[in-house]
């Protein structure tokens, strides 16, 4: 099954943090330790089941999340608090129907001056993250089907999006490169489900049009939701089908390939694959939080490398080892 997550660059001024993001809609509410779940005409899963699991995964590599949440040190990219409560809770909105989802989209479109193109794409995809890192909205049925139809399993979208959102919240930034946001979403998926299922392109169509991109024409030769991404990527790396650091950092949705998606995941995983690397990754995030741009030079410097070649040597060796699993 193909699942696609929304990831757009919305350019707008930043309003003050709000506790009630869609006050004109009626919500049922449930608080978890670090999350508030608001539902309309549907249940609290998958948020009730997987939100705290995702938080624990991200807390292991970004311990500063504890202060952001439990001491309410969270700040939007514009520097505002999310609310006046004693602690911050990230909010997940779950709606059943396309009508309610479209209502949320239009409220945010007006609030942040979205373009018509972004509005239409968001309505089609059926999920989006708040650009100020405070909440996530998911339509649990088909957002393009009138009345919604049957609810779908959205747990992968939830975990992927929360992984992205929690990392972004530590940077106090709205505009981060695709390799960081998508890659950390994939990392969270892998840690929670031992697989990656969220696509930013149609993998099946890509492989039909580009059969040489497969590792092997036989079973297990392509990246997909039923395959172990580390196993396939290990084959790619050993087979010299490698994506350079430069190309991985410059990946864009419009030109993305499945292999680039895999290397984006592998890069983020590599950067937190040992305690030493995790501390350096935390330094990278802290630098961005204090205003630095997430450039290749900053990444190499904070991770302790002088050039692309030395970074790639360690990265590829790790990918080809049994430690990448």
Protein language model features and the residues they cover:
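Generic low-complexity, intrinsically disordered sequence content enriched
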Residues: 11-13, 162-163, 303
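Sec-dependent N-terminal signal peptides
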Residues: 3-13
